[in-house]
Amino acid sequence: MNQLEYLKKYTTVVVDSGDINYIKKYQPNDATTNPTLILKSVLSNKYNYIIDNSIQYAKDIGGNKLTQVKNASDMISVGFGIEILKYIPGYISTEIDARLSFNTKKCVSKAIKLIKLYNNNGIDTSRVLIKLAATWECIEAARQLKKIGILCNLTLLFSFAQARACADADVFLISPFVGRIYDWYQKFNLNSPYCSNTDPGVIALKKIFFYYKKYGYKTIIMGASFRKLEQIQELVGCDRITISLDLLKQLSMKKDILIKKLDVKKITKVNTKPNALSESEFRFLHNEDAMAVEKLSEGIRQFSSDQQELENFLFDKL
């Protein structure tokens, strides 16, 4: 057995990619996309049929050019999701426009639109997760969406306050960004020499894992944005782990045994949950974490920029 096969024994493996050919190759259970990955796939010229179908859809719906760009962009995200779902048994995560990250009402509206697009194309929407940045507004949107049967993946999660608020809202799944937490500490040379069990990203995810399991929260934890194999190896047993194509390939080539590091059975359960965070408590606690404030803002800016680049590309095509 290789390490990827060992990992699959203890953890649900998810591919973080918009490259359908690689998803076919590595056969993950689930897959995630984001604006950066979608843009990369669009510009690769491998999936022009998805682009062409999306542009035709937008033209058929009509409206002014900006409206058509928005509709084509939404259909591209859904189009990649539809194709990926053909090759996985589980969930696809489709991210909404990051520029909506501070508007609960618009997040809810966009999520409903994307789910309708999936439904109109014959997809079982119980297999679709809507990705939202873990801002207070998006966490509230996820709470509202769950009440109408739409499940969400709260992404760009860096602080324990974000994790607590997501648990309070009973969101379906969170994605703590292990690698980007590590990046921040590396930038300031605060984690050298490297050791996986002192990696700040690994420590952050473990803290969330033990908190959720101790208090019986149902929210699924999916480690994300890994930079090193050692980070993944240290988190074997996490509910889910989403992995880039490069690290998947490395895992598939290693033959060493992987040991389960996170074991729910070893955690003592507590029946009474902590009091839910208020909005002001959430904002204060999140603000206390300089890394989380910087990385959440940076992530939203990057995804917003890539979304705008995709729309510029579509504007020229329409």
Curated annotation (Swiss-Prot):
Cytoplasm as UniProt keyword: yes
Main location: cytoplasm
Keywords associated with the record: Cytoplasm, Pentose shunt, Schiff base, Transferase
PANTHER family per UniProt: TRANSALDOLASE, TRANSALDOLASE A
Membership in a protein family: Belongs to the transaldolase family. Type 1 subfamily.
HAMAP family: Transaldolase_1
Protein name: Transaldolase
